[in-house]
Amino acid sequence: MPLLDSFKVDHTRMNAPAVRVAKTITTPKGDLITVFDLRFCRPNMEIMSSKGIHTLEHLYAGFMRDHLNSDKVEIIDISPMGCRTGFYMSLIGEPSAQAVANAWKNAMHDILTKVSDVTQIPELNIYQCGTFSEHSLEDAHQIARDVLAKGISVNLNEDLTLDEEWLNR
C-alpha cells in the first residue's frame, strides 16, 4: 500500500494551531488544487471533542468560504481529520498560507459572534446531518476561543518531512 503524504511528516514537530500546504495537484485540464492541513491541536497532545469538531464542521466550512473564496480561489471541501486534531481543506487555486490563516481567524470570530444558539447551526436536522444529535456549540465555541488565544502559525513541510531512511525501515 502506498504511503500517504500525510504520513510523511513528523507529527511530533507540528505546531498548532497552524496552516500547512499538504499537497498541490495540477489537473489534466490545468486547474491547480491545493490541499491544506489546518491543524487545530498538537498531535498526540490535544484532541477536539467529537461533538465539538462535528459542530465546528457545520460552521467552519461556511465561514471559511465567506472569507477565502474569490475569483481566484474556490473551496471544494473542508473535512475533519479522523484523529480529531484538525481539518483538511481542498480548494481550487493557491492562496498563501497567511491568507488561509487570516480567513481561519475570521471564521473563528464568526463562530463566536454570529452563532449564539444551536438553532443557528446550519443543516442541524435529521435530513441533512448523519448524526444530528452529536453536537456541542459550547465545545465549538471553546475550540474557537482556544485558536484565537494561541494564534495561528504556519507549518512548513521542509521542517516536518520525515527522513526517507526512517520511512523505508
UniProtKB/Swiss-Prot annotation:
Belongs to the LuxS family. Keywords: Autoinducer synthesis, Iron, Lyase, Metal-binding, Quorum sensing. This is S-ribosylhomocysteine lyase. Its EC number is 4.4.1.21. Involved in the synthesis of autoinducer 2 (AI-2) which is secreted by bacteria and is used to communicate both the cell density and the metabolic potential of the environment. The regulation of gene expression in response to changes in cell density is called quorum sensing. Catalyzes the transformation of S-ribosylhomocysteine (RHC) to homocysteine (HC) and 4,5-dihydroxy-2,3-pentadione (DPD). It is an enzyme of class 4 (lyase). Gene3D superfamilies: S-ribosylhomocysteinase (LuxS). It catalyses: S-(5-deoxy-D-ribos-5-yl)-L-homocysteine = (S)-4,5-dihydroxypentane-2,3-dione + L-homocysteine. Binds 1 Fe cation per subunit. Pfam families: LuxS (PF02664). Its cofactor is Fe cation. One of its GO terms (biological process) is quorum sensing. GO terms for molecular function: iron ion binding; S-ribosylhomocysteine lyase activity. HAMAP family: LuxS. Signal peptide: none annotated. Homodimer. The gene is luxS.
